[in-house]
């Protein structure tokens, strides 16, 4: 049986391309030859099944009044149940949690990620086969690239997520990667 890897994230996991001229297909989403999840699948080979679960705007625990259904927390159990069995759960979120409207900081975002990790561990379908969890700090927002929902504090917040997530991974006995 193949080993199953579920990748849950935001636009980075979805493959959003904000400049269609950068995409091979000139579309708003990178194609299967460009998305990191597809590249991971290709690198791992046929013994693995990499499942994409990316949504632009997705947050760890915040409801966004301007975007429907982007809060992962209320749907996490359903996603995990629908994709089980899993060998590895990859969570790469936090960028959208740094939006100015949420008035947050790196520690609060890490607490949101911790809630997700603990919820993921509590899903009854695992039994004794709980998947490993990899917490990935997303690439920080670049300085000077400020979208309407982000400001300089958002840039600094996303830069500090790697440190917070590394501590969290140790506390939760998970793994960590700084993208």
What do the predicted segments below correspond to?
Residues 13-14, 57, 97, 141:
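Active-site micro-motifs of SAM-dependent methyltransferase domains
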Residues 2, 46, 70-179:
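Alpha-helical cap/lid subdomain in secreted, periplasmic
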Residues 54-57, 135-137:
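A general secondary-structure junction signal
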Residues 1-55, 61-65, 78-83, 89:
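Serine-esterase "nucleophile elbow" of acetyl-processing enzymes
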């Amino acid at each position: 049986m193949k080993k199953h890897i579920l990748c849950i994230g935001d636009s980075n996991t979805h493959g959003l391309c904000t400049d269609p001229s950068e995409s091979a297909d000139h579309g708003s989403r990178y194609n299967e030859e460009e998305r990191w999840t597809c590249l991971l699948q290709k690198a791992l080979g046929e013994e693995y099944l990499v499942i994409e679960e990316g949504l632009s705007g997705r947050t760890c625990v915040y409801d966004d009044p301007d975007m429907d259904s982007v809060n992962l927390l209320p749907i996490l159990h359903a996603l995990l149940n629908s994709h089980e069995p899993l060998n590895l759960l990859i969570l790469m979120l936090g960028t959208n949690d740094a939006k100015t409207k949420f008035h947050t900081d790196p520690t609060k975002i890490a607490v949101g990620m911790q809630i997700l990790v603990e919820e993921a561990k509590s899903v009854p379908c695992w039994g004794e086969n709980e998947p490993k969890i990899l917490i990935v700090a997303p690439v920080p927002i670049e300085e000077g690239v400020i979208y309407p929902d982000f400001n300089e504090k958002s840039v600094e917040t996303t830069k500090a997520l790697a440190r917070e997530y590394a501590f969290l991974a140790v506390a939760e006995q998970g793994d960590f990667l700084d993208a």
